[in-house]
Each structure stands twice: as C-alpha cells, then as structure tokens.
C-alpha cells in the first residue's frame, strides 16, 4: 500500500524520498558534487562577506592621521570620524582645517576655494624677493612693489619706510600659510608693468626720427672707446655740439623754411631739422593745401655731395619736425658746404613733380665755423 501511495503522488515525491530510502548513497553523491563544484554558491552554502584590508597597515595609517591632526591643531576625534583619503580628497590635505559636525562625521571648516579667491582679491602681496632674481634696475615699478610688500607672517614690528602704507595686523593674521603661491601673480604683474613701459618707450622712439637713435648710439660708443686708447688721467672732455637756426627762402613768392642745424665734431654727424614754413609776413601760413617732397642737398660750390629727401603730406599743423642726418663730415667740410632745399609737388595728375621753390643756405655762416 505504501508503494502504491508513492506511485500515485508522482516522480517528484519519489525523487525527494530517495534520500530516505538510500541515505548512504545520497550522502556520497552530495559530497562528490560539493567537491567538484566548490566555487558554486548554493542557498545552503553562502560565504561570509568580508571587507578587504587596507593596503596601508592600520598602525601606520593611525600614526599618519595623528600627525596630521596635531599639525592642523584640530580635535583628534574629529579626524577619526570619517577619514577616507581615497573618497574624500579634500580631507586628506593636512593644511585644510577640519571640524566634527553634529551628525558625528568630519567635514571641512571652509571650502578649499574660498581662501584662493580671497588671496587673489583681498590678500596682501608677499615678501620681496632678492634683487638677484629681478630683471629691472633701481627705481621703477619693481621698487614700488617692493616697498608695498609685507612679511608673510606677523612677527616683531619692523620700521616701515616713510610714506609707505602698512596693512592692519588682522589682515596679516588672516593670511594663509601658502603665501609663496602669491608670488606668481606678483611676478606676472611686475613683468607686465615692465613690458608696458618698454612698449611706451618704443612708441615714443617710433614717433621721432630714427636718426636720433643712431646719433645717440654713436655718441655713446665714442666715449666708451676713449678709455681704451688713452689713460683715465688724460681723458679729454666730449666736445660740445654746435646748434643754430636759419631761414631758407623758397622762390620769388617769399615763402621760406625754418631750419635748425646741429653738428657734433666728435662723431662728425650733421643733423638738419625742418621746423616750420613761414609766410612772407613772417608768421605761420595757413593749412598746406598740397603735399610736397622736400630734398636737401649738401653741396660744395659746383658739385653735389649728399642728398636726402622726404615727403610732407597734407596737414593743418604748420610744423614739419623732419630730420635729415649726414655722417662722416669734418669741420672743414661743414665750413665749405651749403644746403640746398627743393620743394616739389607730390599731388596727382599733371601737377605732380612741379617745382614749388628752392633755396640755399651756407652752413659755415650758420654754425659760425
């Protein structure tokens, strides 16, 4: 009857009751299955979940954390509440202050970006660097920046330079420890000031004629070569420059040009500057209606020696301020030379190249040589 009852229940019941019928055989089959599939997870065999250990030993990590807490001057318990440098990179920085919140974990006292913004906008400049690392000379923007710099940390009172503002003590106390990071914007500021000053000087030089730069270089090179040729005791003073102004009449209309002559005997350079145009009445004429080309020719009686020319465009200014330089002239040559000025029309059409006027002036009589 029992067998018939089992057959009536079906094959599932027989499979479940097979272990009861043959207990030794069932235990052997289970042990073989477990040994063959040891890595398979089953409901009756689930391993315990364990957290892998840290790569750094706990003692070394605790010692490092304690040293950081002591250096930052914060509560040691606040550092242990939520310490994980891998997940909280900001908390792993020792110079950032930390505090324990009401919820029991550690947090930053302030944002790490706050002090950076304050240092750019409100922080004072750092201590001055030694002069060996600077590019500028004595006075200038570098010296001004150096007088306004203050020490990085509040220390004993030092006498400030007269006329230099001193920052308040609370501003000095609020400054962060990483003040050396502020040297970068300070260096960029001083470099920008030096670049702006050099650009302004370049623009000033470009407005004036390039002949003045050549004369300045020639004048600076000649005294530099003087000590090598003669002893310092017998140094001869640099000869003075001869300067004079004169007027050159152009044609029969009575128009004239005002010239300024400057001659340096040491360098042998003669500079002629066109100052302005004059009317027959002696005053400044009206606006020039045409553009003209002015040619200056240095010629002894009979032959032409050197020639320079320039184009003067239309302008409402009566002054020309054009320079013509001639090099390698001795006093004897300058004494015998005369300057001839020609003005030609530089307009368009048939009038182009028409002679507007010409005149001549003796340099020896002008410079009193």
UniProtKB/Swiss-Prot annotation:
GO terms for biological process: positive regulation of acute inflammatory response; regulation of cell adhesion; regulation of vascular permeability involved in acute inflammatory response. Keywords: Nucleus. Residues 253-369 form the C2 domain. GO terms for cellular component: nucleolus; nucleoplasm; nucleus. Its main location: nucleus. Residues 153-168 have a biased composition (Pro residues). It is found in: Nucleus. Induction: Up-regulated by pro-inflammatory cytokines. InterPro entries: C2_Ca-dependent_4, C2_dom, C2_domain_sf. It comes from the Eukaryota. Residues 220-237 have a biased composition (Low complexity). Specifically expressed in endothelial cells. Residues 151-176, 197-240 are annotated as: Disordered. Belongs to the C2CD4 family. May be involved in inflammatory process. May regulate cell architecture and adhesion. This is C2 calcium-dependent domain-containing protein 4A. The lineage of its organism: Eukaryota, Metazoa, Chordata, Craniata, Vertebrata. The gene is C2CD4A.
């Amino acid at each position: 009857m029992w067998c018939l009852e089992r057959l009536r229940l079906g094959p599932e019941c027989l499979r479940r009751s097979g272990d009861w019928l043959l207990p030794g055989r069932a235990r052997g089959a289970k042990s073989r299955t477990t040994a063959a599939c040891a890595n398979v997870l089953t409901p009756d065999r689930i391993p315990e979940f364990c957290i892998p250990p840290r790569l750094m030993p706990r003692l070394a990590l605790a010692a490092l954390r304690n040293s950081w807490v002591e250096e930052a001057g914060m509560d040691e318990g606040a550092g242990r509440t939520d310490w994980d440098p891998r997940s909280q990179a900001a908390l792993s920085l020792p110079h950032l202050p930390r505090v324990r919140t009401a919820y029991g974990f550690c947090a930053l006292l302030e944002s790490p970006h706050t002090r950076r913004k304050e240092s750019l906008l409100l922080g004072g400049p750092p201590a001055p660097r030694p002069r060996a690392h600077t590019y500028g000379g004595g006075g200038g923007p570098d010296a001004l920046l150096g007088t306004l710099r203050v020490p990085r940390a509040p220390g004993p009172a030092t006498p400030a330079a007269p006329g230099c503002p001193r920052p308040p003590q609370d501003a000095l106390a609020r400054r962060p420890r990483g003040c050396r990071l502020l040297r970068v914007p300070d260096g960029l500021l001083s470099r920008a000031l030096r670049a702006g000053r050099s650009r302004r000087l370049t623009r000033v030089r470009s407005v004036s004629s390039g002949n003045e730069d050549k004369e300045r270089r020639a004048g600076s090179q000649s005294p530099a070569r003087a000590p090598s040729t003669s002893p310092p005791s017998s140094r001869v003073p640099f000869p003075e420059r001869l300067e004079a102004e004169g007027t050159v009449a152009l044609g029969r209309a009575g128009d004239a040009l005002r010239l300024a002559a400057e001659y340096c005997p040491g360098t042998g350079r003669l500079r002629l500057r066109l100052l302005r145009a004059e009317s027959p009445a002696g005053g400044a004429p009206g606006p020039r209606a045409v553009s003209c080309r002015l040619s200056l020719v240095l010629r002894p009686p009979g032959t032409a020696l050197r020639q320079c020319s320039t184009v003067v465009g239309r302008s409402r200014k009566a002054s020309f301020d054009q320079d013509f330089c001639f090099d390698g002239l001795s006093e004897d040559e300058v004494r015998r030379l005369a300057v001839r000025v020609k003005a030609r029309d530089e307009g368009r059409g048939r009038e182009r190249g028409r002679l507007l006027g010409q005149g001549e002036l003796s340099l020896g009589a002008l410079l009193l040589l």
